[in-house]
């Protein structure tokens, strides 16, 4: 309730003028007065004003985070999948589950959908990362398009590169072309250790250096408590060992530009395509997710 103080209500004459109408010598005298009423509003100290509700909190109730271990009741044209790649405002989602009543259910598992993110998720500040398990709606199975309407809870999150639900991190460097830089490798290792997930160090292009240099890096990394893997995408040396380390987990391959990340993914696709679940996940982008069922 608002009250007005009688003492504060003031009536003031702003202007009092005399105006003449008519020609010279025959004017009609009219007096006009203008008044302005002003008052000072006082708040009642006994009344508590309710604060405005937080719009972000209200919107978050419309899209609560889904528990990772629970499956929502899917309706027609909905599906559950994992984000494989992200480019600008578009996400590629690998379908993992569809409604049980959906005809051709088996044919839709593993399909890749090009998706956009629901605007509400952006307004409430909910990030959507590669590796996220998501709920998609309005699926067009012909054009393979859909909309991401919600995100499941995460097990883990990597900040650089931004990716979620990772079990295993592969740090890939090359021994030459470009030559491995100890400072850059240390920075990658420190950031990886802060995540708290399993780490594998792989050194590519071992055919371009001497055996003495390979042994030198093996001794150095072992002194840092890492067991390095040496490989050559060009000669396919050590690829089997890397594939073995990628089994039954979600892995991310990171490293500087030019070390052979894309080449490694391509050779894994071509050599182990029969053992890879959802091989569409392997794309030559800045990071890669792998799903092995060996």
Swiss-Prot record:
One of its GO terms (molecular function) is GTP binding. InterPro entries: G_CP_dom, NA-bd_OB-fold, P-loop_NTPase, Ribosome_biogen_GTPase_RsgA, RsgA_GTPase_dom. Residues 1-68 form a transit peptide. GTP binds at residues 255-263. Residues 155-294 form the CP-type G domain. GO terms for cellular component: mitochondrion. It is found in: Mitochondrion. The keyword Transmembrane does not apply. Keywords: GTP-binding, Mitochondrion, Nucleotide-binding, Transit peptide. Belongs to the TRAFAC class YlqF/YawG GTPase family. This is Small ribosomal subunit biogenesis GTPase RsgA 2, mitochondrial. It comes from Arabidopsis thaliana (Mouse-ear cress). The lineage of its organism: Eukaryota, Viridiplantae, Streptophyta, Embryophyta, Tracheophyta.
